[in-house]
């Protein structure tokens, strides 16, 4: 079993989600019970909906609990250096278009492209890991090979 990096903030967020999901269990069980009391389960939309919700809830709980044992929790406030690694915020420039992008490299359970966070397992992050400001990388993307220059590497700590 390999370890999965996650920030302290990301771990805390998942723990809160797990607590919330577990607190929803009694209400779903009650909804199933009430729907079952309505009679014929074959044509009972309320029962079907409650069972489906229960299935999704239990699947998410199971997923989070199984990941917990694999997490390597990393305090972003303790990170520093010149090389790109987990927790780094990196600004890169597309050498063809001149377009600049800024990403923070976090664990797969924290990646949110819209928020500027990418998984350390993504192709871009894998190409960046271990590199420094001024280095060039090449990423194989659906539209072809893209060359980037690393403009800056920073460690900004936890995002509050």
From Swiss-Prot:
The entry lists its GO molecular-function terms as:
DNA binding; RNA polymerase binding
UniProt keyword annotations, A-Z: Coiled coil, DNA-binding, Transcription, Transcription regulation
GO terms classed as biological process: DNA-templated transcription elongation; regulation of DNA-templated transcription elongation
Q: Note the InterPro entries from the entry.
A: GreA/GreB_C_sf, TF_GreA/GreB_CS, Tscrpt_elong_fac_GreA, Tscrpt_elong_fac_GreA/B, Tscrpt_elong_fac_GreA/B_C, Tscrpt_elong_fac_GreA/B_fam, Tscrpt_elong_fac_GreA/B_N, Tscrpt_elong_fac_GreA/B_N_sf
Per its UniProt entry, which superkingdom is the organism in? Bacteria
SUPFAM superfamilies per record: FKBP-like, GreA transcript cleavage protein, N-terminal domain
Q: Coiled-coil intervals in this record?
A: 11-38
Give a Pfam family name.
GreA_GreB
Question: What family does this chain come from, according to its entry?
Answer: Belongs to the GreA/GreB family.
Reported function: Necessary for efficient RNA polymerase transcription elongation past template-encoded arresting sites. The arresting sites in DNA have the property of trapping a certain fraction of elongating RNA polymerases that pass through, resulting in locked ternary complexes. Cleavage of the nascent transcript by cleavage factors such as GreA or GreB allows the resumption of elongation from the new 3'terminus. GreA releases sequences of 2 to 3 nucleotides.
Q: Which PANTHER family does this one have? A: TRANSCRIPTION ELONGATION FACTOR GREA
- The entry's protein name is Transcription elongation factor GreA
The organism's taxonomy opens as: Bacteria, Pseudomonadati, Thermodesulfobacteriota, Desulfovibrionia, Desulfovibrionales
